[in-house]
Amino acid sequence: MEIWHWFPGRQPEAAILAALTQAGLRHYACESPPLHGPGIVFFDEINDRLFNLLREASCRGVERVIAIGLLPARIKSAAIWSLLGAGASDVFAWDHSSNAAHEVAARFERWEKVDEIVRSPLVKANLAGQSWAWIRALRQLVEVAHFTASSVLLTGESGTGKELFAQLFHTLDSRKNKRDVVVCDCTTIVPELSGSEFFGHERGAFTGAVSARDGAFALADGGTLFLDEVGELPLNLQAELLRVVQERSYKRVGGNSWHKTNFRLVCATNRNLNEEQIHGRFRCDFYYRIASWTCHLPPLCERREDIPVLAKHFINQLCPGSPPDLDDAVHEYLLTRDYIGNVRDLKQLVTRIVQHHVGPGPITAGDIPPNERPRGSNESNDRREQSLELAVRSAVASGLSLRDVERSAGELAERIVIEEEQGNLQRAAARLGLTDRALQMRRAARRQNGNGKP
């Protein structure tokens, strides 16, 4: 694979570059980190310029950046955590050993495999989105599903796609001859029948048990067990399930013999299970058994840039032959509307709009059902102003001055538009109301003032 590398003001030693080449990495030097592609940032001192560069790489989105220190002394733990928090994917101290380059190459190779799966038609056909928050969640799921044998706990609000993630988890599982997914909706389990639902029962175990029956643990043997809304399980049932999750063996209700089962466990919840533990509503030991890995699915309000992508995805599903486009008014309406039910809410709205649409032309504001339309012409502007006010309140509360707020807002707007235009500064400048030259000068000034990348 090909990566870029950047060392402010100089070039790394030839021996370092040769070691990277021998490890199988094709690499090229750049004067400043590009907008796209994985790369390495070399540093011989830890300063604001390094942190700003990593923060900008993180704001741009989805790329992998390894920070490699060429320092005579060991990098302190606090500095490593700060670099990771600023946006580095990993931090290495180059020790000139034969393994250093291979360790770096191994990271990039794994990440490349993960991203190949994330970009694959298998994933894109069912899970649409390109925001950083969404890509990060997909990467976490691919990592645990395809490259480990661990269980995973999916967290997130209702309607964020946890069931689709569970299905993808099973699909990406690399086990051979795996069986199907067994879904247990924990909100519908009747306490009196929970033993039979999970463990199965023998004939005559209770009134009405006219024959033996397999439960979820038997049915999931060789496959995947999905416990949806696991936070709704009562404490006594959590205790009963704990042994099975830990030992992978169970007894049927009314039976005496132990049965082995081998399944991968996926759990999902819209509750904060850490708080539930504090209040005694969820067992700590059960939590740590089901949460070998956790993957949080962001709400739609944290990935609004995905709304047009999702809307187009749903329209393509509803109109596979000739999907209509969205005119500007509908596009803006979808972007600024609130979605209490997250992606599920958006899908239902798009479905109603498409069903109301007639003709080969684009979907227009008149296709929006009357009860869904904004109540006034200023509602969209009001929502944008409310979102902006919340962001400014947060910035001021954190101690930023007016000058800092203005500068940060301007830099963030530039970064977002440049990313959306895939690095095309001419189009980005037009959207920002600047000339090409003005945008280039603003970026150059930030670089000269030590604020990292333009």
Model-predicted segments: where are they?
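N-terminal accessory segments that target, anchor, or regulate ATP-driven/P-loop NTPase machines
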Residues: 1-121, 176, 301, 331, ...
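Dynamic helix-loop-helix/coil hinge segments at AAA+ ATPase domain boundaries and subdomain interfaces
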Residues: 115-138, 192, 397-406
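Nucleotide-binding/hydrolysis machinery
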Residues: 120, 124, 130-133, 142, ...
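Conserved RecA-like P-loop NTPase ATPase core
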Residues: 137, 160, 184, 198, ...
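Bacterial C-terminal helix-turn-helix
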Residues: 348, 385-454
